Amino acid sequence: MKSLLVVMLALLLASPVSYALTLDEARAQGRVGETFTGYLAPVAQDGETAALVARINQARAESYRDVAQQNGLPVDEVAKMAGQKLVARSKPGEYVRGINGQLMKK
């Protein structure tokens, strides 16, 4: 069951998304940061970044719900597992939210 969950999370996290501002661009520009909750946090306070964060977080929430239902797990547990992977996979110079709650460069 855990291996299925890991595979599904990997597919979720690797799926390409096309927006005016892409997630990769936003990360590279320091406009968003990953969190241990599994959701993006805005670093920049502009409309384009806010819209991207809202879209990505909504899609993630739906995916986390699907994975949780398929594996009989709480949604927040699935989200936290994904968040740990996303923070760990963040590149040097990208923002992540630390355990102190502050967004900082990795």
Predicted segments — roles?
Residues 2-8:
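Sec-dependent signal peptide recognition
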